[in-house]
Amino acid sequence: MAAAQTSPAATLVDVLTKPWSLDQTDSYMSTFVPLSYKIMIGYLVTIYFGQKLMAHRKPFDLQNTLALWNFGFSLFSGIAAYKLIPELFGVFMKDGFVASYCQNENYYTDASTGFWGWAFVMSKAPELGDTMFLVLRKKPVIFMHWYHHALTFVYAVVTYSEHQAWARWSLALNLAVHTVMYFYFAVRALNIQTPRPVAKFITTIQIVQFVISCYIFGHLVFIKSADSVPGCAVSWNVLSIGGLMYISYLFLFAKFFYKAYIQKRSPTKTSKQE
């Protein structure tokens, strides 16, 4: 009997050029997951040695490039939010709040929400470039920054194939925040002065994002433990890791907010996330 032949994994070109197929995308992501670990390690190594290399060099003048970079991410986030948020509200109005993070509906299989949800996950790879701008411009790379970028990237990639329903909230919140945040950073890159409350507002909406996420994850833990919503699309491995991740984000950003705006040690500093 001839051995069964295994079909080759789908490629990035397949996902981008062929009609949307969740099976095809999952096939591609199965090969991208191991690569994501290598990318994360390369990212951390580049930060370390990049700072060493820049220690005795003049900072690069990347003002216009950085502005375009941030405007690009703001535009991408705005378009993705426009494509994904209406579906969230549709499920919310039709089936209620709990259903919006328990029921998948056709979130992953629909050609529009499926593609833009996947595009969001993949965007976390180029977002790592935010840190390279800090390194090349000899700006501080604080723990909160690289920890958030690295962990969000790997978590998004590794958990994609789980097709969790709560992702519609995670993506909607993150994209809404990033649309505003990256636009702000683009404006600041051009040395355009903004009122101090704007920076405070950016950090505040980041914290609100994590508060909402922590609430949803907390409720999902209760739902999963009591099996109060049969068929709720959430798994323990994703829930436990994601819950700890969001709690750590909330702690770090709240601590930053306290130091930057309550203790008033850094009058012009704002946090930059993914």
From Swiss-Prot:
Task: Provide the phenotype resulting from gene inactivation.
Answer: Suppression of ELO-2 causes an accumulation of palmitate and an associated decrease in the PUFA fraction in triacylglycerides and phospholipid classes. This imbalance in the fatty acid composition results in multiple phenotypic defects such as slow growth, small body size, reproductive defects, and changes in rhythmic behavior. Suppression of ELO-2 decreases growth rate and reduces brood size.
| A Pfam match | ELO
- Protein known as: Long chain fatty acid elongase 2
Q: What is its main location?
A: membrane
Q: What InterPro entries does the database record attribute to this sequence? A: ELO_fam
Q: Which reaction does it catalyse?
A: hexadecanoyl-CoA + malonyl-CoA + H(+) = 3-oxooctadecanoyl-CoA + CO2 + CoA
State the annotated membrane topology for this chain: Multi-pass membrane protein
Q: Which residues form a coiled coil?
A: none
List membrane-spanning regions. Answer: 29-49, 73-93, 115-135, 140-160, 170-190, 201-221, 238-258
GO terms for CC? endoplasmic reticulum membrane
Q: Which UniProt keywords apply?
A: Fatty acid biosynthesis, Fatty acid metabolism, Lipid biosynthesis, Lipid metabolism, Membrane, Transferase, Transmembrane, Transmembrane helix
